[in-house]
Amino acid sequence: VDVVVDGARSPASVYWPENAGVTQGAVWDLDEWVRRWAEIGMNTAREVMDFYGKTAPHVLAPRMNAIRARAQSALTAQAHPPTTLRHRAGPGDVTLDSIGRPYADFFALEDLVVRHTRFDGADSGPLERAIFVAPDAATVLPYDPVTDQVLLIEQFRVGAFGRGDPQPWSLEAIAGRIDPGETASEAAIREAQEEAGLTLSDLVPVGGYYCSPGAKTEFLHSFIGLTDLSDVKSGIGGLAAENEDIRSHIISFDALMALVESGEAGNSPLLISALQLARRRADFQANASG
């Protein structure tokens, strides 16, 4: 097809999806696309082009959603976190000399050579580092302030198994990856519905944090989800399409804190959320009764 741009006529190709089952969405709006997707799209393109000439398009296509999620996380990281005590990084404080990706699928591995300014002002020299690249995720601990109960989920975790843990089933807060175009709170609400069939009445931020910044890029956005658990039963659920096998537990707040004390609540999002719940529990209960 020929198009006219700035008064000049030029030939253009039109992409038409092979899948005849594609359904029509909302009317496309350029300004809305730019606002929501442009920077994510550019970050996505940077990673995709690293595979140019190395990976066939049909192999890369199933990875696109994961690549977009990583691209969005890199964009979210550009927010300005507080630097009241720690060093405030400026231009030239960190230099990336080289980057390699020996593996990229749902997650990615990157080999970096970086250098940074030391606390004494000297240059660190080239440092070889490997990082595990994972997109941002949201976690939510459902709490009923009327019954003073929480909902935990339990599932097999391959990370615990790979470490050699003889008990690789993990008690956790509800959690999931933040999908491209989705906010952390939207992801928390969606995951509560998918994993436990819950509708949350309020979402209270716990905090955002790296779980292991020495080796992993994953940044967690944790919430406490206020909800009514009076008619919710423990059971088995999860999305079949994602091979999820999830068991839910409705337990008292005191039982939760006993799990924290014993070490059975052995993962950072649950520990952090439980301790924050302990700090704010009286306020939640007062608001529910008032």
Label the model's feature ranges:
Residues 114-118, 212-234:
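Active-site-adjacent beta-strand/loop module that shapes the phosphate/pyrophosphate-binding cleft
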Residues 129-134, 141, 146-190, 240-242, ...:
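Conserved Nudix-box catalytic region and its N-terminal flanking loop in Nudix hydrolases
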Residues 1-90:
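Glycine-aromatic micro-motifs
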Residues 237-264:
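NUDIX/MutT-family hydrolases
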Residues 111-113, 142, 224-226, 250-252:
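Short, well-ordered beta-strand micro-motif
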Residues 199-206:
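A short coil-to-beta-strand element that immediately follows conserved catalytic motifs
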Residues 103-147:
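Acidic, metal-coordinating catalytic segment for phosphate/diphosphate chemistry
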Residues 92-103:
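Short amphipathic beta-strand and strand-loop transition segments with alternating hydrophobic
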